């Protein structure tokens, strides 16, 4: 019998919770405005040593101790004995997975257990397992057979422990092995993941089922990818390292092989000397302000970011944050959170960064979020107003008014050459290098530049997208208007803005798409009519020829940050003329 086909006749089949949305709809889904990295407080001005000491002290108090581990093993043994007694002919074994096995459990963590039968076809249903547990004196037995992964929840009043049991979902044990291998690669990984999971639990942001947010496993994958992208990297991609791959490494048609000897890669991240406090602060800076949620997918399998367009995820439901499942690569782990929820979580990231940057207080950053009573409607309104204060990075709240180390405006551009590389989450986004002060760069940084009148036919290079292109030859802007866009446009990366400017003429947009395909040599050259002529070299920029204009460009020039491979400079770039 299928595990999930027991709805209706099972008295344990009930909702174990009342769904309470964590991020209210009133926050809205309007995208957050971009924030200049130089407007954020510099890392050298933050007392990361104090933050590290607080983190380690809190980590030692919450991490699962030996006595807690013994209680968990005793509970698992008790459950296995019950199952073998109730189902003597099922050849049942149990396997721990989740945070307990991956060394990421705290004293308050639940137990995750996989019930394995041989053969799998003779497995009992979740309702049968629920009834067996109830007959043997276990409390609070709940059967959730309609979930994506059917589970049985059970509570032991003697050991004061709860457990979630699934049946024959062995892929979960492989995910745990992979996570454990990453944890053992570097001594900073375990405390960093544990503390970020602790923050998420305190802020009620790790409950995908009840609050519509993220799972703890998704958050752990975000941390792993963040550490893989440090400069220099702290973690490798264990699935990309050479390892044994044969028929035994295939499960449900998926390649689940990886390099599983962490001792051989221990010391991989020794060149990176960042402390726990630095990594904790930079995690929230990166996902609060710097990560491009619109275009990229987090992939620990590849140890980098992937393009949403390349994976075909740009039109998926709930795809604001995309985290690739390391084995089942067609699955987005973060699709449990919709766009409004992810906007709220991103603002929560910003809140933590502000509190750490100006107060250096981990307890304040991890303060407990408590849901209000159902009759208290003003609480969530106040919470939304508090989140909206994080949209503008002025940080006027929660810091000393005499602190002038960070302002809403970036530093004087004549002293810095700014170039932001979204492929590398570097600790400091600016370079101490004098540049040519004879050129007026104020139009790049100033918020007071008047909008260009609609009748002026010039477009300007979007610095963020151009930096992506220059830094990676394989990167292709998702659309024509992502690469060349109106400066100060309210829709800087929107294809709808392109349609509005040209009267909704889809034919012209299709012509620009054909130029994108021609650059990859997927289509033969063909002639097209319209205001834009078809040229195979329309996007002929290369990292070694940054100033070469496209073949159909005008002579108009604008200043844009370019060439992140070499010494960063600000140089002129040819712009298209519409």
Swiss-Prot record:
Q: Name one GO cellular component term.
A: cytosol
Query: Which GO molecular-function terms appear in the entry?
Result: ATP binding; metal ion binding; mRNA 3'-UTR binding; nucleotidyltransferase activity; poly(A) RNA polymerase activity
Q: Where is the composition biased (Basic and acidic residues)?
A: 496-510
Q: Does the keyword Transferase apply?
A: yes
Query: Pfam families, from UniProt?
Result: MTPAP-like_central (PF22600), PAP_assoc (PF03828)
| Region annotation (Disordered) ranges | 495-565
Renumbered to this chain, the Low complexity biased-composition regions fall at: 547-565
| The organism's place on the tree of life at top rank | Eukaryota
Which biological processes are named by the entry's GO terms?
3'-UTR-mediated mRNA stabilization; mRNA processing; RNA 3'-end processing
User: Which residues are noted in the entry as Mg(2+)-binding?
Assistant: 110, 112
Xref: InterPro entries: MTPAP-like_central (IPR054708), NT_sf (IPR043519), PAP_assoc (IPR002058)
- Name of the protein described by the UniProt record: Poly(A) RNA polymerase cid13
**What are the Basic residues biased-composition ranges?**
516-527
